[in-house]
Amino acid sequence: MLIEPKMIGSSEGQALLESLLNRFQIGDSGCQSAVEDILTAVRQEGDAAVVKYCRRFDCPDMTASALAVTAAEIAAAYELVDAAFLETLAAAIERIHSFHEREMEDSWMQTREDGTIVGRLVRPVDSAGLYVPGGTGGSTPLVSSVLMNGIPAGIAGVTTRVMVTPPGKDGKISPHLLVAATEIGITEIYKAGSAWGIAALAYGTATIPRVDVIVGPGNQFVTEAKRLVSGMVRIDMIAGPSEVLIVADETADPVYIAADMLAQAEHDPQALSILLTTDRQVAEAVPAEIERQLKTLSRAEIAEKSIVDRAVILVVADIEEAIGLANDIAIEHLELMIVDPWAQVPHIRHAGAIFLGSHTPEAAGDYFAGPNHVLPTMGTARFASALGVETFLKKSSIISYSQTALQNDAEHIQRLANLEGLTAHANSVAVRVK
């Protein structure tokens, strides 16, 4: 048996729960020094450094003049994708766009009785960079990453949207990625992967423009690079391994549960798959079903390692306990396979995305339902949210006083300024109300 169910009240169950509650980790991933060197090289050498690293790790024949994807390459990409893909792409774009356009925020103003005007001005950032992983050398293009990161930026009104992605050894990028980017209005695409791609977006080179926001998933080098440049640019988040928590009662189908745990496990050997169930029979049926389905998967080796090392099945007393534990764990993806999932929604406080009912696999949210699939991991759902339109917006406060309004507030402003020992602040009011 790849995974053995535990009772939540047992010592083993409590130990597993403790590890889940303390899974947040930020430390040296083992590549910090190497990434720092890459960032320094790109900052100082620009395109030359990007080309150097690209030649070393991706395309041996890369040149600076070939970093930017050309119109001819885009046109060729359209010849290489089929009509079925274009149909699915259009449908996914419509779903994702329809959801995210509801997130757009408006500027607002408030005029008080004394004539003071205060408000908030909402504006998009000028530029955003999307990092899209190569996807097993381009053989498994991550089209969903293009859509989930690029569409919200477009809705926000970002003028300059650029994409970087590693080329294959032949210097080419997956036609599916090129078409997806083009269909959502991204016209600047560059062949730059890993930490040097992030560095180029953060610092700018002669070819690749510097941006204000960097979003997109990647390996430990990409994640470390984003962490190191955050502060000088906004990043979406520091993402850990992907994770799912399934709450199931006696009505849940072990086949569905196993399928969804494996869907998570095939991402990464470090992916986390958790089942909290009120039913012992369900808990005992799932491991056998996992083993049966595992044999059919293309990424069986990765999924099996993830299940063996990282999967957890805990039997709990009731749904209330399961929801309480789910809130404590603050999972990225929360699935409710129970009789009345909607009844529990008011009790859920911490989850990146919530999937209600047995016919709502996480995969629907990953690709097509509409909500964003870039979600907080490692327990950060306690305070963080999914990537969205807001990721690409910034807000400025508006304040306008009339002479009468300032006269009315002057005493209060000066009193607080003097209390803090900032007499120049107080004086800046006093000289206006003499």
Swiss-Prot record:
GO molecular function, a single term: histidinol dehydrogenase activity
Gene: hisD
Matches recorded under Pfam families: Histidinol_dh
Protein name, UniProt field: Histidinol dehydrogenase
Pathway in which the depicted protein is active: Amino-acid biosynthesis; L-histidine biosynthesis; L-histidine from 5-phospho-alpha-D-ribose 1-diphosphate: step 9/9
SUPFAM superfamilies, per database record: ALDH-like
Matching HAMAP family: HisD (MF_01024)
Organism: Desulfotalea psychrophila (strain LSv54 / DSM 12343)
Reactions catalysed according to its record: L-histidinol + 2 NAD(+) + H2O = L-histidine + 2 NADH + 3 H(+)
A GO biological-process term: L-histidine biosynthetic process
GO cellular component annotations of the record: cytosol
EC number, UniProt record: 1.1.1.23
